[in-house]
Swiss-Prot record:
The lineage of its organism: Bacteria, Bacillati, Actinomycetota, Actinomycetes, Mycobacteriales. Residues 5-170 form the Exonuclease domain. It comes from Mycobacterium tuberculosis (strain ATCC 25177 / H37Ra). SUPFAM superfamilies: Ribonuclease H-like. GO terms for cellular component: cytoplasm. Belongs to the oligoribonuclease family. NCBIfam families: PRK05359.1. SMART domains: EXOIII (SM00479). The keyword Electron transport does not apply. Its EC number is 3.1.15.-. This is Oligoribonuclease.
Length: 215
């Protein structure tokens, strides 16, 4: 297995694999030290009015507030094209199939939609997954000081921004949880959060200036 991680986040019209649609997918590849490789990719796919009108109110409000619904309506990208765009980016940094684990937050849900709609992408990834949410849950039980000191989550509910948050969160756990006991003090945890937050602000500015086109 290689050291790269493939981070993916998806936005859907809901969580029902039987009826809901995949409408946005973003991907970033990192090395073993969680350094981001390349610019990443963020693709919004078209969905028809029937799919969008079937969203429950909370999801419809979330995607309206983020601007995603308008982008979905305007998009001409289908699932096959989006899958090819994501694979083109990943192939720049991961040369061998089935070597790079999928990483993200609550990633099993995303992978289920990927397996349904983008089987070539799914089969390219290693079967193992790195779910940052699992580390969060373990910290809540074993290291509450770290859990309650974690960086605040954003509320953009957009795929690329969510990946950046997930990477930042794993960087946080690497520096606070994956260390010899007794671990960092409360003030040391706060210092890590402040440093990571400063970096996140700079990254958001870069994303805004150089966001990949959706097609």
């Amino acid at each position: 297995m290689q050291d790269e991680l493939v981070w993916i986040d998806c936005e859907m019209t809901g969580l029902d694999l039987g009826s809901d649609k995949l409408i946005e997918i973003a991907a970033l590849v990192t090395d073993a030290d969680l350094n981001i490789l390349g610019d990443g990719v963020d693709v919004v796919m078209h969905a028809d009015d029937a799919a969008l009108s079937g969203m429950i109110d909370v999801v419809a409000e979330m995607h309206s507030r983020s601007g995603l619904i308008d982008e979905v309506k305007a998009s001409t990208v289908d699932l096959a094209t989006a899958e090819a765009m994501v694979l083109d980016y990943i192939n720049e940094h991961v040369k061998q199939p089935k070597t790079a684990p999928l990483a993200g937050n609550s990633i099993a849900t995303d992978r289920a939609f990927i397996a349904r709609d983008m089987p070539t992408l799914d089969s390219f990834l290693h079967y193992r997954m790195i779910d940052v949410s699992s580390i969060k849950e373990l910290c809540r039980r074993w290291y509450p000081r770290i859990y309650f000191g974690q960086p605040p989550k954003g509320l953009t509910h957009r795929a690329l921004a969510d990946i950046h948050e997930s990477i930042r969160e794993l960087r946080f756990y690497r520096r606070t949880a994956f260390v010899p006991q007794p671990g960092p003090s409360t003030s040391e945890i706060a210092a890590v959060v402040a440093e990571l937050s400063d970096g996140a602000g700079a990254q958001e500015e870069t994303d805004s200036a150089e966001a990949p086109q959706s097609g």
